[in-house]
């Protein structure tokens, strides 16, 4: 059973998170207003029969709340849900990105990406190209 104080803390964090939609912030604020009286001091009178009433708020979940801009792009990535890869533009691997890192660990990460069945073909292709670039740079 979730701790009501932690649920309230999460709702308060939602209010200050810049990656959360205005609609989600409004729902969090409504939740805080309706559930904070007495609970901050440890009074759990809002619970009925040991059950947490917090789950009632999930009934009006709006999937569009995760989209927070005019283009309809997910705040955590693009339309497909993938987060933009910072290595997508320009060189896949720049020397300053490798500086201070164990090159064999970097290579191992790319190799793991290529063999991971949960990774898209696009990511595997990028990993292959990055490995080729690393090999070219280390041989030069």
UniProtKB/Swiss-Prot annotation:
Q: Where is the composition biased (Acidic residues)?
A: 54-71
> Which GO CC annotations does the UniProt entry carry?
cytoplasm; cytosol; nucleus
Region annotation (Disordered) maps to 1-88, 110-140
One Pfam family in the UniProt entry? Con-6
- Biased amino acid composition, Polar residues: 34-44
| Signal peptide bounds | none
Listed Basic and acidic residues bias regions: 24-33
**InterPro entries from the xrefs?**
Conidiation-specific_6 (IPR018824), UPF0654_domain (IPR052670)
Q: Which family does it belong to?
A: Belongs to the UPF0654 (con-6) family.
Q: What is this protein called?
A: UPF0654 protein C22G7.11c
Originating organism = Schizosaccharomyces pombe (strain 972 / ATCC 24843) (Fission yeast)
